[in-house]
């Protein structure tokens, strides 16, 4: 028997078919969120305050310094914040020190900086009572990038971009004549040498001395001539640059100097961030650039004079090993140049210069310039960086160096929560800085305190805006635990500072070889966001620079054995190594079993000797994300279908009694454990008490821990989040063990669906085109039943005419409709309600005249309802019926915070139990989705020889063209597992082989083809062919027909066109569009067409009269003019076109406005005005009083129109 037993948690043992031993456990799956936020609290905040502070006033008298900060206790707990629709946040207090330089007086003070949102243990934020996730952003890393294009004549165009984190871009480019230009901040281009001159190297000789020979440089110097003899070359260049940056302004050398200093050399305006400095130093360092080049000078040890490398020697890895030590020294081959006094930066510039041979012409020597090991703490760019980057640009044209691939993950980095928050907070602080400066100059320096200078509004506004409305702050997907986990691990290339959907081409979206082990090549949305939204691979981590790292096992260079040492490599580090696959066969001592192995190097898959191998993958599943790693037999599925499978697992609805898959992949336990919905034990101990609401654990040190379970809570997606204990009294529990299953969990494992008996067969054409025929048992036994909870809210406000009132006494409502309401008009918990039932009775005062003193007295004594009120009760919307699960009442008296003008708020939760029905969407894990087309009685279902009826019938046509064969393998192995009564694990890329499956089939006593004879439930006859029958994990998805079905007779209309609104959410109608009109015209259905275009749509008067006629039983009147036609006429009139409507006799037809009255044409407003006039006319005759009896009709249609 193949396979071995593996225990997942304490409650589930599976037979695993994995062959590769796990050398590294999966990391905590939400650490991308929690670690980043922790960094922000520990370092990020402090770093930002230190950046902005000290703030000095314009005269330099006062300065405000940052001392320290602390977060106090949060005002609400997580649950209270949810309940009160508040933020889960803590007050931030900052200690500031104000120094008066004239008197030497120092004042320290603690200043409140607003409430700062805290991250929950699950990696989410609670903002206004809703759980939100800050998605990590994938952006282009700051650094220097080189690229090569061709123009229309196939000539090479070289380009360079120096990208900072904040500040002006610097771009170099060549034209068809090989002249090099520079652009500053996307302005017009100027010859590159002008920028060099502005840096203080004015003469051509100096420039040639620095850069050495280069064709492009010579052409550029020829182009850049001295135009104005009155100015020195440096001053002239400064003025030229100023003219490009500020066209039309008077140009002087001084203003240009200060402008360039501000653009590039002021740390407040230009920030490379540590990652930018790291990338620039790495790209321009001679350590990487000298490899593979031939030296044009002899290099010696500056101390001893010993030769390190001879002239004419090629620098290979061995030479570089000796050289590297010296290249890091501050005195090795360093050259210092003194810029002119007029330059932008007048400090001496030190660069590292080594002469190398031109690869195309060995006689010619080239200068290779490094930026001289600039300190990693330096945030802005330096003249040495600019000179070295230009030198790289020139050498690139001579064939030395390499261009950069912008989609390489060494050039894209992750901005996680902490950094995004920091950037947002910085914006708030810099706005505050301006205010502080102004206040410093206004207020009296003697008496002012830090508190008086600080205005925290901009800081609070910036964080509020970020959490509330940033594209990266998203309402958490809480359909099931896997959806939550995936959302927290999502990487988006969209958002502020990122890409936009329309501008992103194919290259950005495509899978890149550096995604291996870093980003999942499978899990990404279908549609316009494909490839822009990705997921972190299962073992991926993010380093301090924001690059994604993935772990590899080190292969010893001496004896070529795989060691236990694990190294995390970024994409550009990995490019230097050869990496063997995780499934390369190994001997027991760690040596490779074969002399030649499959390996990866850069973008190639190669067969190579084991002497060349540097590393080995840690696990086959390190390539994919968590959701993808949940698909068994992933290796047998087409990638497009696997993508759908991974995405649809996130949409599985939590069922009432879920079961974890019989055929798992071994990641189910870890995914459920880290998702945040399971109840985890904090400290080891023994369980003392268990019930449905709490678990108590006696710790080993004697203390008692009480854990409250989450019961029937509404999740973000309206699903039911509920926890069930899985431990018993006297169980010994360890720290971090699962005490209670959350939604979609069973025995501590992820359980997104059920394991029904499935046959691939057709049945009466009911499973045509991905339709699914199901057994009535699945409905009757609540196999796929789920609970959905919806929340409804009603507020009693103060209006101009008096306060609204929650009450049971609602005008014109019978006692029957009030049977479930208490004395305050609020529905009781447990009541069964249907569409249209009242949940909260509420009345709003109507406009009435002031009561006389007598009426007021009567009202006070008898409490008569003398006042006119309107019924504004909260009712159950269409399709919202169910059982009232909970009612929460918030009032000011109870100390609840309500928004201004609100006196009382009632929140009602209604739970629905939804059984599986025709129209619901279901899916397996291999992208095999369909909708339920028929529910067949159990006795009519095909049954197996032992009498077991099939649960689900799928169309066999759904397999071959889709190429997701994984479902067939799962089916067979699942049947074997069911017969053997065990659970199995078949990890991705390392699972059961076909021989393992056939062995399991034989062991389970099944037929050798793994098929079965099936009998027709209606006739008892066997079917002609044997049928593949087995067990597959099958899920019900969140796309349920109950949420989609919709009907309308009368309802709301659009204000301008008076046509019905569209969509279920607006209770809209079906649009009868242009093509549908053609269809009716083709059939000559004139009256149907007329009704559709008038009464049923926007003939305002006709609607009302038709309704009236139906109520009174009179013949339906002729239609009037559709309102949209009038809108069209008005629009044409607005263009100055006189538009008239002519009747059949060429006489003009009068188009009345909606609100004009007429005896024939009656609209709702006219009807109510008419009724009022009748009351006023006391001397009116009886006939007039009886006119159009409009009591019942207008009320309803009036509501419909508003």
Curated annotation (Swiss-Prot):
Instruction: Give me the ranges of the annotated region Disordered.
Output: 1151-1202
Claim: Membrane is one of the keywords in the record: no
Q: Where is the composition biased (Acidic residues)?
A: 1151-1162
InterPro entries in UniProt: DNA-dir_RNA_pol_bsu_ext_1_sf (IPR042107), DNA-dir_RNA_pol_bsu_external_1 (IPR019462), DNA-dir_RNA_pol_su2 (IPR015712), DNA-dir_RNAP_su2_dom (IPR007120), DNA-dir_RNAP_su2_hyb_sf (IPR037033), RNA_pol_bsu_bac (IPR010243), RNA_pol_bsu_CS (IPR007121), RNA_pol_bsu_protrusion (IPR007644)
Q: Please provide, in alphabetical order, the Gene Ontology terms of the cellular component aspect for this entry.
A: DNA-directed RNA polymerase complex
State any GO BP term from the record. DNA-templated transcription
**Signal peptide location:** none
Q: Which CDD domains match?
A: RNA_pol_B_RPB2
GO molecular function annotation: DNA binding; DNA-directed RNA polymerase activity; ribonucleoside binding
Q: Does the keyword Transcription apply?
A: yes
Please state the Enzyme Commission number of this protein: 2.7.7.6
Q: How does it assemble?
A: The RNAP catalytic core consists of 2 alpha, 1 beta, 1 beta' and 1 omega subunit. When a sigma factor is associated with the core the holoenzyme is formed, which can initiate transcription.
Role, per record:
DNA-dependent RNA polymerase catalyzes the transcription of DNA into RNA using the four ribonucleoside triphosphates as substrates.
Give the family from UniProt.
Belongs to the RNA polymerase beta chain family.
Q: What is this protein called?
A: DNA-directed RNA polymerase subunit beta
Species assigned in the record: Pediococcus pentosaceus (strain ATCC 25745 / CCUG 21536 / LMG 10740 / 183-1w)
